[in-house]
């Protein structure tokens, strides 16, 4: 009887362990992990999450955008510095970040976000900025491909417009922000469409 009871217990345990082995691993929310790492300036954790996410996307053959953690952190910091005020809308924050990414893609500006920010001049001390959550989430959306503006919008001004105005925002304190087009549209004619 003891042998039978022991055998049945072992079979039940073996069945339980086999069932556990077939359970799927829970999906990891790499987006949340990377945003959390950006907000807390945990660069090693953020890079690891980005590498894992991008490896999963590669293994799946996904067309989803690969997001570099260093770009996410840098853009998050720039958005916090330039558009991190709580009173600003998410839409305005998206547009501010989009101007920076449009510049990276433009033949009129340097080819990397860090170089664009260095040239801009208004981003001194950027590496010491701790991103806020809204800015990190906005940076993620932008790096994932979300766009609101024409890609020829290369300027943002809180004062007098610096070129042909594409969009105007007014915050609740009646401060206007203008998003302006390049003064060299001919550089973009071939690739528009």
Predicted regions and their residues:
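N-terminal secretory targeting signals
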Residues: 1-67, 183-193
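Bacterial extracytoplasmic/cell-wall-associated proteins, especially those involved in peptidoglycan
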Residues: 54-193
């Amino acid at each position: 009887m003891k042998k039978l009871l022991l055998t049945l217990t072992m079979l039940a345990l073996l069945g339980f362990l086999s069932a556990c082995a077939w359970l799927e691993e829970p999906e990891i929310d790499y987006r949340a992990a990377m945003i959390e790492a950006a907000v807390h300036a945990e660069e090693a954790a953020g890079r690891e999450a980005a590498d894992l996410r991008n490896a999963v996307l590669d293994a799946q053959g996904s067309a989803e955008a690969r997001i570099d953690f260093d770009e996410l952190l840098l853009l998050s910091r720039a958005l916090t510095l330039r558009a991190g005020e709580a009173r600003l809308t998410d839409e305005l924050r998206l547009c501010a970040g989009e101007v920076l990414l449009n510049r990276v893609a433009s033949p009129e500006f340097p080819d990397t976000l860090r170089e664009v920010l260095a040239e801009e001049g208004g981003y001194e001390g950027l590496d010491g900025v701790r991103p806020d959550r809204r800015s990190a989430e906005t940076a993620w959306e932008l790096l994932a491909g979300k766009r609101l503006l024409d890609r020829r919008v290369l300027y943002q001004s809180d004062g007098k417009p610096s070129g042909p105005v594409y969009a105007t925002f007014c915050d609740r304190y009646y401060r206007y922000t203008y998003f302006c087009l390049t003064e060299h549209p001919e550089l973009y004619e071939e690739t528009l469409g």
